[in-house]
């Protein structure tokens, strides 16, 4: 494993009964890059992503993070190693404020149990750090807003803020643009670019314009296998990708 690669899979696969959802996926994610995992519906993206974040156990193959074999490591321990998925710790409490949600995530990162009956004064030292994280994702002005009352796009930003509370070296985002309007897509895309500084990001995303704008490298899955890999120009020019992903003649721009 090269030191330039932060995450590597070796012949990673998952079978459900007699159905091979993912087969022989060899993935290399370069340190400091934004890497996209794309493909048509049923290509195996979600299963692959779930294996990487340890929510689904691989049937075979290995997963290496920073050279360490994490194939059998528990999700919580993987997060402590610096590999975090956006929803992994960000089940947002709808009736807490944005600040309180991030503070809960910081408590988890410190190993403190969350206690609704604990005096707020004991949590005050976490407020400054929580505000810094909210500022990073553009939510400083919504710090005291109850989560249920903020827009869906800002909820997605809050999810990212709670994930950043883990101080991850690598961030995995599962369809970050899903359900967003055009204005929110632009906002979250800019946020992803901003938080990628000094971090590695792997994302599953269906919005090809976002993939084109953000990704340094793209892996295309189809029928559970890697079909192509490269930058957007190379992948979008690949005839097999056109046939499998969007159909011949689709305009990629």
Outline where the language-model segments fall:
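Glycine-rich phosphate-binding loops of nucleotide-dependent enzymes
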Residues: 2-253
């Amino acid at each position: 494993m090269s030191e330039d690669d932060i995450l590597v899979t070796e012949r990673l696969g998952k079978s459900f009964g007699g159905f091979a959802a993912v087969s022989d996926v060899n993935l290399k994610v370069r340190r400091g890059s934004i890497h996209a995992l794309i493909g048509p519906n049923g290509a195996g993206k979600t299963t692959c992503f779930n294996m990487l974040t340890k929510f689904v156990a691989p049937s075979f193959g290995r997963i290496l993070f920073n050279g360490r074999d994490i194939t059998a490591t528990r999700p919580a321990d993987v997060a402590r190693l610096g590999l975090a998925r956006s929803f992994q710790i960000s089940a947002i409490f709808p009736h807490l404020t944005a600040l309180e949600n991030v503070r809960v995530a910081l408590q988890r990162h410190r190993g403190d149990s969350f206690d609704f009956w604990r005096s707020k004064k004991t949590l005050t030292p976490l407020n400054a750090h929580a505000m810094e994280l909210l500022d990073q994702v553009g939510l400083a002005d919504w710090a005291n807003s109850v989560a249920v009352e903020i827009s869906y796009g800002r909820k997605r930003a809050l999810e990212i803020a709670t994930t950043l509370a883990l101080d991850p070296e690598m961030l995995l985002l599962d369809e970050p643009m899903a359900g967003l309007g055009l204005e929110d897509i632009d906002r979250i895309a800019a946020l992803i670019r901003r938080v990628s500084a000094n971090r590695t990001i792997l994302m599953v995303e269906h919005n090809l314009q976002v993939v084109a704008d953000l990704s340094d490298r793209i892996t295309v899955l189809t029928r559970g296998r890697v079909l192509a890999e490269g930058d957007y120009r190379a992948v979008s020019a690949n005839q097999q990708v056109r046939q499998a992903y969007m159909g011949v003649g689709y305009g990629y721009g």
